[in-house]
Amino acid sequence: MPKEVYFNKPQRLTQLIGANISVIVAGRRTGKTDSIAAPFVLRNMQRMPGSTGGIVVPTFKHGLTNTLPGLFAAWKRWGYIRGIHYVIGRKPPKTFAKAIIEPAEYEHVISFYNGSCAVIISQDRPGSSNSLTLSWLLVDEAKFIDYNKLKDETLPANGGIKSYFGRHSCNHSIMILSDMPQTQKGSWFLHYKDKMDSEVISAIEGLVYDIWKLKERIKQYKESGEEVSKHLIYSLRHKDKQLNQLRSIATYYKEYSSIENLQLLGENYIRQMKRDLTPLTFQTSILCQRIGIAKDGFYSSMKEAHKYDASDMEYLDNVAQSYYEDDDTHLSSICSHMDSRADKDTDPNAPICIGMDYNANINWIVAGQPSGRRLNVIKSFYVKF
C-alpha cells in the first residue's frame, strides 16, 4: 500500500522541476538535507543503476554529523534500510549488483543494492575526488565550500558515463544546498540565479501538470474497465520525452526563508531564533536575506586567511569506522564523540586562554591556545540581551 509522505512547497517544487542543476538557498530547518538532498541522491542512484555520484561536504566532520544523518533518516522513513538496501564504508555483499566502475576502496562510499555508489568527498581531506568518474554531485553547505577546490578537483570528475546514462536528464546533475552566505567567498553559487531561464522552468511546470492530467485520465479509464486509447499513451510518452529534454538543460535557482516550513516549525521556533541568534545570523540563516558586508566593523576586516580547518582525520576515521561496521548504530551516537578530540589544533596539555568582550547587546567569550605567533581560536560562546 502506498505511503503518504509530506513535503513542503520548496521540497515539492524542487523535486517536480527536476532540473539538471538545482541551487536551493534556504533558511535553517527547511528540510534541505532531509527532503531535498535525500530524494535527489535516491533518484539518481535508482534511475542510474551502477553509477557513481559524489556527496561534497566542507569537512568530514560535517558530513558525519550533519549530511549523512539527514540522508539516512529520510531513506529509513521511506523504507530503505542500512545493511539491507545499502551499506557504507565497506565492500558490499555479493548479493548487490556491481558498480560500472568499482571504487578502488570503499572506506567512505555508500553502496546501493543496484550497484550505484556515492562517494563522500570532504574538502579537508586532500585528493578525495581524485581519479573519480561521477554521474552526479550533491554539494551540501555550499557557503563553506572552497569553490576553487570544487572547480579544480571535483567538477571535472562529473563527466559521467554517457554511453550508459546519456538519455537521463539526471546524468551530470548537480544539487547545491546552503543557507544565505555572509561572506563574498561563500557567495560563489549565487550567480546561478542569472543562469536560470525562467521560460524553461515555466515550460517544465506546464509539462508536469499536463502529464499529471494524462495519468489521471488513464487511471480513470482503467478503474472503469475501459480500454485506454493509444492516443493517450502516445501523448504521455511524447510529453515525458519533452520533459526529459527540458530538464537536461535546465538550471533552477530559488531562495526560501525558514518561514516556508512554518507549518512544521511553528511560530515559537522563529521567535526563539530571533531571540537567540545575532541579527546578522537571523537575517541570513532564518530569513535568507542577502546582506552587504559592513566596512566599519572588526569582523568584516577579517580575511579568509584568518580561517582554517583543523580536523583530526585519524580520530574521525576511527569514529566513522566504528559506525560503518555496525548497521544498528545510529549516527546520533557519533555526536557524543565530536568533542575537542576531533580538533587537531587543540593541545590537551596546554592551557586555554580565555578572552571576554562585554557589549551593550551581546557578551562574548572566546577560548584559544597560542602557538608561536599564531593564536588558534578553538571555541567561542555568546549570550544576547
Question: What is the predicted role of each segment?
Answer:
Residues 2-19:
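Pre-Walker A adenine-sensing motif
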Residues 23-91:
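Conserved P-loop
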Residues 28, 122-124, 176-182:
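A short beta-strand-to-loop transition that corresponds to the Sensor-1 phosphate-sensing loop
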Residues 64-133:
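Inter-Walker segment of RecA-like/P-loop motor cores
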Residues 140-142:
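Walker B catalytic acidic pair
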Residues 144-264:
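ASCE P-loop NTPase helicase motor core
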Residues 248, 255-354:
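ATPase catalytic-site recognition across NTP-hydrolyzing enzymes
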Residues 332, 336-338, 345-348, 366-385:
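Nucleic-acid-processing active sites and adjacent nucleic-acid-binding tracks
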